Curated annotation (Swiss-Prot):
Organism field: Bacillus pumilus (strain SAFR-032)
InterPro entries: DUF520, UPF0234-like_C, UPF0234_N, YajQ-like_sf
Disulfide bond annotation, renumbered to this chain: none
Any one GO cellular component localisation term in the record: cytosol
Protein keywords: Nucleotide-binding
Protein name as annotated: Nucleotide-binding protein BPUM_1028
Lineage: Bacteria, Bacillati, Bacillota, Bacilli, Bacillales
Annotated GO MF terms: nucleotide binding
Top-level division of the source organism's lineage: Bacteria
């Protein structure tokens, strides 16, 4: 078996699923008693979530509702980078949350280092926003997938193009 096998390690957030989770969270907020009369809102602007609420406590509750809905839709919550809470107009507070899509250089280096430290006979290289892993043996590639799932990475990773 001279042919090499490969797969890609990527980190993606499905925006339609995020939009569905936002809509479900807004629907729940509209019906919850503790949010009656409050100015709470969640919006998706390109690849950024904007959470607005009356105070910090309600903002945290808003985040909890959103995270619950994201988890139900299988959206990785590790890929959400919450910014600082800022005071907005009308006595409300706002928080922006950036959706991280793609593997940046630092995380790619961590992934490559983990693979090299494991001693598995595969090669890994960083391409654009993904890491390609190649090896002669498919069992080695599956071992790398298992290693990545166990690793405590700051982002959620998926595995695609297993050939």
């Amino acid at each position: 078996m001279a042919k090499e096998s490969s797969f890609d390690i990527v980190s993606k957030v499905e925006l339609p699923e995020v939009q569905n989770a936002v809509q479900a969270a807004l629907k729940e907020i509209k019906n919850r008693y503790d949010f009656k009369g409050s100015k709470s809102d969640i919006s998706l602007e390109k690849e950024e979530l904007v959470l607005i609420s009356d105070d910090d406590f309600k903002l945290e509750q808003l985040k909890d509702v959103l995270v619950t809905k994201l988890i139900k839709r299988n959206v990785p919550t590790k890929n959400i980078d919450y910014g600082k809470t800022e005071h907005a107009l009308g006595g409300t507070v706002r928080q922006r949350a950036k959706l991280i899509s793609g593997i940046d250089q630092d995380n790619a280096k961590k992934i490559n280092a983990l693979i090299k430290q494991s001693g598995i006979k595969v090669k890994s290289q960083f391409q654009d926003d993904q890491v390609r892993v190649t090896g002669k043996n498919k069992d080695d590639l599956q071992e790398v997938i298992s290693l990545m799932r166990k690793a405590d990475l700051p982002i959620d990773v998926q595995f695609i193009n297993f050939r």
